[in-house]
Amino acid sequence: MTGILGGTFDPPHNGHVALARAALEALPIDRLVVLVAARPGHRAVVADADTRLRLAQEAFAGLPAEVVLDEHAFTVDAVRGGHFGDAVFVVGADEGAAFPTWKEPDEVLRWVRLAVGTRSGYPPPDLERYGDRVISFELDSPDVSADQVRARVQEGQPVHDLVPEPVAEAISELGLYRGYTDSAAEKDPKSH
């Protein structure tokens, strides 16, 4: 089975890595593909696509993952056609809860199943309407977001506890996110 982890990765953080690791441990995944959205249709990005690809390659270097740039604007377009074969699209509980608002969620599930990482002590997202096309697995993940990482960089604060060390080094080396403001990466309510 192929596991697919998609996102803007602006920047990738420890939560993304924990999600990938938990999926690899809990599910019969023999191939993990990390799709870095080049031009996502659901949100603005701060760093350019090639930079985010580099950051994701650094973040997932310790895992058996293939990190690639995805030119599709929406998840449905990336998975349509079934070219990933038997596949699950891996998301955390927050994205799982937002799944019904994604562009063509039923079409996404025609081609892949949704694998939702849920945290102990938190209610799982209500996705029962999708039946066996949605599976869940236990996730022990740090509470971190890309917004939090960018805000810390903007404030001149260290991010070594939020992102893998090579990502922190690349952010510093490239001078990323220093001019970040919340409005620079606002989310469109119609996502993925």
Residue ranges, per PLM feature:
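Nucleotidyltransferase catalytic core that binds NTPs
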Residues: 1-192
